[in-house]
């Protein structure tokens, strides 16, 4: 700098900046910290995490997406890893822990290459070459099947390790039944809209009391005690308008000078409700499910006619009811005809736990169904709900794709072996990155073994030996403390879950590697008395975020 030259201040006072290798190192450490936080939850023998929020509410789970969503993460790079988990969960419903653990390991391997002087861009290019080759290998080794036995295995794999205990077989059957019920074929392609599977939960009973309903469960009771508890051969009217006297849009007053006219006025109101109920009765409906309110007088006349009615049904439930029963939602009672009514074998009010619910059951060819989860505590039913939602998603995408892969780390072991060989055919320093990618994949079988208390080194050696012999379905056998044939054990993973996890991990790893400058603005209202680093986050002089 020339003598007397005044330094130019570009950033505001208090802004902290990290550049070059320091920025890269801190970003990598943050990503590794997040990966390590969920790594012990991977696989059927993975451990659970207890999460306590600021008001003392407790969540016990080993679901990666749930854990990361509930964690209070501040580091910007750590937040990027959490976003990977969210993206994986949104796209395919499972494999969140795998994606995060792979992200952390890819960055760990990249750190070694950075120490050797390999440029981040070269590492990123090598990783992209590796993931493209991995996609080809996965397509080659994928198995084809959409039969119920395969779908059941997919469900069991998704449920394993969750807090569903001895109920996995039972729950897997419910999941397959639900997915098959809502599956449709459009233009020769199988489509499964999992939004048409309603998952409800109620405390009480055991997990084995969980029910599949060929129809929809509504968390509402009938509006009048005199209405029937059970309606057989139900003809269902779905009404999106209030069975009430409409209020005028302008303020109006009615002045009655003759006291005898008061009764006439009340009679007119009563007649209006009678006409409403008469229209419903004339259509042939014996069940009314209304999205809006039902007046007390209308309730009385509906009960008098033996018509079962529920009010203020959620819009989402109304849409599912239409798909399940074949009914059309009407907004005007004049449009209520026999042709717009839905059908169900039974509509029944049942007491579930402390609540009364309406069951619309026995729908013919329903395109929307329900699963009602039972369990002893809030923690149990919530974890079963998370497990079922994951299982439903992965079974649905397997049904759509018609392909699956062998689980237990078998795919990662096969990819690691083939990519190591592929690296030899690639010139330049990208070869080193592809080799690092192959080595990073071994974190999955290694972690599965570690979490089960099995020697990871011996397991990896045996696994490599089996795959060198061409046995692509051999993975980590957690039951026999070694390696085994996943085909014989029925351990399978959906193809889309694996490919998406790989792609997401590579995307975030390459993005983080290319960051060489972190500029953090000063907090406007920093918490008093805090200094140093946030607990659990890596240090190395990283500014607080």
From Swiss-Prot:
Question: Any idea which UniProt keywords this protein has?
Answer: ATP-binding, Chaperone, Nucleotide-binding
Q: Where is this region: Disordered?
A: 522-545
Keyword Nucleotide-binding on entry = yes
Ranges of compositional bias, category Gly residues: 529-545
Matching entries from CDD domains are given as: cpn60
What post-translational modification does the entry describe? Answer: The N-terminus is blocked.
Output the Pfam families linked to this UniProt entry.
Answer: Cpn60_TCP1
- PROSITE patterns associated with the record: TCP1_1 (PS00750), TCP1_2 (PS00751), TCP1_3 (PS00995)
Stored Gene3D superfamilies: GroEL, GroEL-like equatorial domain, TCP-1-like chaperonin intermediate domain
What's the family? Answer: Belongs to the TCP-1 chaperonin family.
Give the protein's function.
Answer: Molecular chaperone; binds unfolded polypeptides in vitro, and has a weak ATPase activity.
Which protein is depicted? Thermosome subunit alpha
What organism does the UniProt record list as the source? Thermoplasma acidophilum (strain ATCC 25905 / DSM 1728 / JCM 9062 / NBRC 15155 / AMRC-C165)
> Which gene is the coding source of this polypeptide chain?
thsA
């Amino acid at each position: 700098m020339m003598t007397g030259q005044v330094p130019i201040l570009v950033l505001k006072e208090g802004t902290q900046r990290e550049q070059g290798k320091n920025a890269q190192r801190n970003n990598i450490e943050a990503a590794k910290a997040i990966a390590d936080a969920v790594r012990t939850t991977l696989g059927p023998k993975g451990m659970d995490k207890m999460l306590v929020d600021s008001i003392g509410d407790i969540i016990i789970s080993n679901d990666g997406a749930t854990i990361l969503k509930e964690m209070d993460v501040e580091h910007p790079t750590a937040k990027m890893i959490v976003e990977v988990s969210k993206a994986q969960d949104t796209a395919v419903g499972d494999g969140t822990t795998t994606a995060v653990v792979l992200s952390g390991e890819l960055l760990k391997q990249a750190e070694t290459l950075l120490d050797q002087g390999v440029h981040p861009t070269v590492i990123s290019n090598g990783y992209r070459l590796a993931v493209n080759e991995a996609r080809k290998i996965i397509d080659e080794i994928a198995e084809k099947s959409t039969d119920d036995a395969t779908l059941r295995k997919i469900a069991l794999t998704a449920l394993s390790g969750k807090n569903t205990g001895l109920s996995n077989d039972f729950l897997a059957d419910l999941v397959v039944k639900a997915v098959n019920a809502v599956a449709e074929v459009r233009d020769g392609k199988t489509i499964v809209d999992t939004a048409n599977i309603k998952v409800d939960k109620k405390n009480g009973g055991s997990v084995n009391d969980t029910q599949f309903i060929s129809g929809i469960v509504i968390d509402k009771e009938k509006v009048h005690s005199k209405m029937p508890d059970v309606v057989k051969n139900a003809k269902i009217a779905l009404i999106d308008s209030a069975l009430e006297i409409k209020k005028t849009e302008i303020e109006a007053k009615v002045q009655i000078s003759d006291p005898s006219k008061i009764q006439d006025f009340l009679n007119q109101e009563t007649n209006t409700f009678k006409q409403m109920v008469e229209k419903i009765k004339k259509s042939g409906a014996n069940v009314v499910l209304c999205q809006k309110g039902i007046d007390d007088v209308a309730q009385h006349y509906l009960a008098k006619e033996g018509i079962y009615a529920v009010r203020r049904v959620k819009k989402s439930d109304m849409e599912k009811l239409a798909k399940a029963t074949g009914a059309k939602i009407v907004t005007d009672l004049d449009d209520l005809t026999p042709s717009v009514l839905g059908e169900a074998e039974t509509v029944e009010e049942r007491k579930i736990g402390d609540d009364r619910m309406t069951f619309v059951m026995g729908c013919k060819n329903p395109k929307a169904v329900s699963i009602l989860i039972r369990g002893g505590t809030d923690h149990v039913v919530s974890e079963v709900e998370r497990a079922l939602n994951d299982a439903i998603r992965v079974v649905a995408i397997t049904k759509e794709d018609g392909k699956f892969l062998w689980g237990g780390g078998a795919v990662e072991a096969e990819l690691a072996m083939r990519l190591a060989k592929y690296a030899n055919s690639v010139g330049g320093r990208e070869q080193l990155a592809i080799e690092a990618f192959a080595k990073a994949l071994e974190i999955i079988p290694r972690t599965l073994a570690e979490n089960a208390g099995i020697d990871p080194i011996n397991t990896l050696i045996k696994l490599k030996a089996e795959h060198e012999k061409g046995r692509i379905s051999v993975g980590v056998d957690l039951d026999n403390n070694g390696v085994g044939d996943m085909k014989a054990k029925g351990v399978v993973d959906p193809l889309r879950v694996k490919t998406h996890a790989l792609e997401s991990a590579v995307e975030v790893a390459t993005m983080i590697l290319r960051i060489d400058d972190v500029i953090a603005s000063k907090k406007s209202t920093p918490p008093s008395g805090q200094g140093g680093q946030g607990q659990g986050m890596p240090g190395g002089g990283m500014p607080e975020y």
